[in-house]
Amino acid sequence: NISNGTERDFAKIMNQYASKLQMKNTSFKNASGLPNRAQMTTARDIALLSHALIKNFPEKYKYFKQEKFKWKGKIYKTHNKLMLNYQGADGIKTGYIKDSGFQLAFSAKRNEKRLIGVYFGGDTGRQRDKSLKIIMDKVYGDLNLPTTKKEEKEVKIKIKNNSYAIVVGTFKYKKNAEK
């Protein structure tokens, strides 16, 4: 327990951590991520949080790639269908809120190159997964790494580190992203 036991206190701690990560457009109001008019974030900020999770908490990150787990006698299965079908996938989190549609924070690692993709605004979970898969494949292709497609092309780029982030739809509301 890292708070005084209240959700408000927990959200305060989350906001302090978000500030340390330079998540400049995020305000947490609850621990669940369920809708709250005062709670907001961006795809960029979720990418920062995802990167910090992977880097700073590797012992906890293993839980984000589980296909299923058992809790109090009940088996729970992941909603992250892309993770089940994407080469190198190892997590992170799906979501849905009416105002911003189907969302996904996603990570994959191939040949020691990790990509973090964050997608907001999907009309369906399937459409969200398909769109993010296309983007991830494109970036891996540009890095000249294996993709889930069989097409090959040679691209030369200079790489400074092994972490990349893809941010799509950095809008609070889906309707703004479509303008």
Q: Positions of the model-derived regions?
A:
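Short acidic/histidine-centered micro-motifs embedded in hydrophobic/aromatic stretches
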Residues: 1-2, 17, 63-66
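LysM (lysin motif) carbohydrate-binding repeats in extracellular/periplasmic proteins that recognize
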Residues: 176-179
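Substrate-binding clefts and substrate-entry loops adjacent to catalytic sites
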Residues: 1, 26-29
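Alpha-helical scaffold elements that line and support the substrate/ligand-binding pocket
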Residues: 1-14, 46-49, 117
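Short, charged, amphipathic alpha-helices and their helix-cap/turn boundaries
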Residues: 8-27
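Domain-terminus/edge residues, biased toward the C-terminal soluble/receptor-binding domains
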Residues: 23, 27, 35-162, 167-170, ...
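Conserved short loop/turn motifs at secondary-structure junctions
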Residues: 2-3, 32-36
